[in-house]
Amino acid sequence: MALRPKNPAPRPAPRLYLMTPPVADPSPFSDQLASALDAGDVAAVLLRLAEGDERTLINRIKALAPAVQDRGAALLLAGRADLVARGGADGAHLSGIAEFTAAIETLKPERIAGSGGLASRHDAMLGAEQGADYVMFGEPDPAGKCPVFAAVEERVGWWAEIFEIPCVGYSESLETISPLVAAGADFVALGDAVWREPDSIAETIREAGRHLRLPEPAT
């Protein structure tokens, strides 16, 4: 598919995209997830699964899916495109262009396919050309290390200026949400910043929502 230039129509307000910690036991986490989703405008939840056999992983997905989908958000799986249909998820987020290319045919056109872990501008464009529903910049690598924020901000700004396909910018903290919004992110992803203090999840989401406000237009 050919990349389309950015539509000059008025920009909608960005939305939140939540990344879970690796989930081993869905029972206690389900309440935390519901608290987060009830507190703000969350478009999608990326479910990261702790290691387990296939049946165990599918059961975890099925246990958490209602908390997400009944609240109008999409449930995406980190990596495991092969479990999307059987677990009742809405799609998968694939890290790296090789993983995305290998999985895209199992997801499209019925399911969401997100492209992340992108090492270069070229990889981002390849993912979009192959059918990505969104691209993500700045997410943690497998060791948990994030790129320098200035590089993420620059990449989001470049993409948002040119391309129609939505872009997600990963924010390590609440303080970096507003710069990503100003750069043009359609969605802002949050991970550990949400789950670090279980008793404060709802307030963290509400505060994140305040940072999502679009900047005032220049006069």
Question: Can you annotate each of these PLM segments?
Answer:
Residues 1-93, 106-133, 158, 164-167, ...:
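Conserved N-terminal beta1-alpha1 strand-loop-helix module at the mouth
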Residues 138, 191-192:
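Beta->alpha turn/N-cap motifs
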Residues 146-150, 199-200:
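Short, solvent-exposed loop/turn segments at secondary-structure boundaries
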Residues 131, 183-185:
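As written
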Residues 91-100, 142-143:
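Gly/Pro- and small hydrophobic-enriched strand-loop and loop-to-helix capping segments
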